[in-house]
Amino acid sequence: MSPIDIAKNYIRAAQTGDQALLARTVSPTVVWHQPGSNRFSGTHQGLAAVGAMIGTMMEVSQGTFAITEAQHYMENGDWVAVSIHFGGEREGARLDQAGVDLLRIADGQVAEVFLFSSDPEQEDHFWGQ
């Protein structure tokens, strides 16, 4: 499977909530770099920690946080950049913006993730401290 195919499986699993596909696609030792200056920002180590973070994101967003579009998949060796659109809503705040997910593929799985947001201030406000 090519790095782009693996990236597409990751995005599909994230969009549909397919936990089995996510577990097959993301390395148990994934390193996740969450941008910004909010309660989720920083580096998270391992699938369990990332899963817990995403679970809390879903709680905060009342289940609305989602990748709504993934348009371009661009490969450079073991790296794949994906242009995305993501959003969510919670009482008093809305998240709606473009971003880039930069994925490092190793041994057929997503091994490292760097996320980029087009409006970091909006994202920080949405997630809070």
Where are these regions (language model features)?
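Short, low-complexity N-terminal intrinsically disordered segments enriched in polar/charged residues
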Residues: 1-29, 129
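Short, solvent-exposed coil/turn segments at beta-strand boundaries
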Residues: 25, 75-79, 103-110
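Short beta-strand segments enriched in hydrophobic/aromatic residues
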Residues: 26-27, 86-88, 117
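A solvent-exposed, acidic/Ser-Thr-rich amphipathic alpha-helical stretch
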Residues: 27-76
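A short, polar/proline- and glycine-enriched secondary-structure boundary/capping micro-motif
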Residues: 43, 92-94, 122-127
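Short, cysteine-centered beta-strand-loop-beta hairpins and adjacent loop/turn segments enriched
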Residues: 62, 88-95
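Hydrophobic/aromatic beta-strand elements that line small-molecule binding cavities or substrate pockets
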Residues: 67-73, 85-87, 98-103, 114
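Short beta-strand edge/turn micro-motifs at domain boundaries
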Residues: 102-124
